[in-house]
Design a protein with these regions (language model features):
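Targeting-peptide/extracellular-domain and disordered-appendage signature
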Residues: 2, 6, 25-121, 126-178
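Bacterial N-terminal signal peptides
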Residues: 10-20
Length: 178
């Protein structure tokens, strides 16, 4: 015959056994890598340290840059509620692009520098681009913590410079800054 004390001990023992079974069945899964892997490129130029941290989107057989329907043109980012039409390029001409994937690309410099002859103060900036067929706008924006270009605000631009694209004869599968 079991006593209350024996019954309590038996219940406790069963609880321990069942807890052990439950704990051992919960397996730790390794984190799944992002589709667009994060990368950082850093360079010392003179005494200035410059780095770009970005996520590397892949082409995956898609058209990267090109024309979009005229009703979604302008300097509104794709991320502002516009849905990419089927078979449309990932980054349309004339739209703000995060210059990577996932979070906005981060540009960091430890000294005041000149970019295309224009001053940029030392600091961290989100790095965006507005691609065009013949000319691109490079944007250094003071909001360095934004996701993509969802909340891009042109009034926070520290610097905008224009540049001419130089197209490579062969393409890379992943975005790469060097």
């Amino acid at each position: 015959m079991f006593s209350f004390k024996g019954s309590l001990l038996l219940s406790f023992a069963i609880l321990l056994v069942l807890s052990g079974i439950q704990i051992s069945s919960a397996q730790v899964r390794p984190p799944v890598p992002r589709a667009s892997q994060k990368a950082t490129v850093a360079q010392t130029i003179g005494t200035s340290e410059v780095s770009i941290t970005y996520s590397r989107p892949a082409v995956k057989g898609r058209t990267v840059y090109g024309d979009w329907p005229s009703d979604v043109k302008g300097e509104a980012t794709l991320d502002n509620q516009n849905t990419r039409p089927a078979n449309a390029p990932l980054v349309p001409w004339g739209h703000v692009w995060r210059a990577g994937a996932n979070e906005a690309t981060l540009f960091t410099v430890n000294d005041d520098v000149l970019i295309n002859g224009q001053p940029l103060a030392a600091g961290k900036y989100s790095f965006h681009m507005i691609p065009g067929k013949d000319e691109w706008t490079i944007i250094f924006n003071k909001d360095d913590g934004q996701w993509g270009s969802f909340s891009y605000d042109a009034s926070k631009d520290a610097l905008r410079v224009k540049t001419k694209p130089q197209w490579a004869s062969d393409s890379e599968e992943l975005l790469s800054y060097s």
